[in-house]
Amino acid sequence: MDDIIELAEGVAESLGEGAEVSFAPEFDLKGLKTKKLVVVPVGIESKPNARDYLEDRYKVQIGLLKKCTEDDVPELVREVVRIGRSFLQKYVCGLRCMKTEYVPHFSPEHLRERRQFTGVVELTFLTVHRTEP
């Protein structure tokens, strides 16, 4: 697999709930009563693993956005964690999710300025393959 876009689309499909792939997410949530799930392809990191083998790490971020109050934040943080954990050890497009990272869990600035929860989890998918001679 060498198509991070295909992986992002696979993650969005796995999420369901109207999740969509976006390359420059910026949303106006005025009037939005339900949550919005956005998948962003972040990048690919490649490095030698062993003789004649390469390790590729594909990184994809999932954003959960929702209008909310501060009282709603604990449950929304828990939901972001549940989403991330649901992908651990799971295969999407033939790649296995080996790591989830929540740094930060959400954006305090968005909460203060927009009354919007923006939580992000970064998924790392791993593949090891033989290099061409």
Residue ranges and their predicted role:
Residues 1-23, 27-28, 42-133:
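Charged, amphipathic alpha-helical segments and their flanking helix caps
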Residues 33-44:
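A short, hydrophobic beta-strand-centered structural micro-motif
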